[in-house]
UniProtKB/Swiss-Prot annotation:
Domain Sm, first and last residues per copy: 10-69
Gene that encodes it: hfq
GO BP terms: regulation of DNA-templated transcription; regulation of RNA stability; regulation of translation, ncRNA-mediated
Name this protein carries in UniProt: RNA-binding protein Hfq
UniProt-listed Pfam families: Hfq (PF17209)
Quaternary structure annotation from Swiss-Prot or TrEMBL: Homohexamer.
GO molecular function: RNA binding
Keywords from the named record: RNA-binding, Stress response
Protein purpose: RNA chaperone that binds small regulatory RNA (sRNAs) and mRNAs to facilitate mRNA translational regulation in response to envelope stress, environmental stress and changes in metabolite concentrations. Also binds with high specificity to tRNAs.
Naturally occurring in which organism (per UniProt): Cupriavidus necator (strain ATCC 17699 / DSM 428 / KCTC 22496 / NCIMB 10442 / H16 / Stanier 337)
Disulfide bridge partners, by residue number: none
Alphabetical list of PROSITE patterns matching this protein: SM
One Gene Ontology CC term in the entry: cytosol
Superkingdom classification of source: Bacteria
Family label: Belongs to the Hfq family.
Amino acid sequence: MSNKGQLLQGPFLNALRKEHVPVSIYLVNGIKLQGNIESFDQYVVLLRNTVTQMVYKHAISTVVPARAVNFRVDDAAEA
């Protein structure tokens, strides 16, 4: 994955985690998962609803927050 991709992903997912924003995660096979982001790393996202699911990032198509989220990306990443 490119460095720019990481610079966007990290702050976005971290804002969702810190603010406990409910999300819908759509997988590449069309399945929709819902919950709150508990944690994440380079390869996986932990999604908590009634149970905690480990979702591999390569299987994720789209992350849709339930509300708007402000997150800051370093100016260097906006090139």
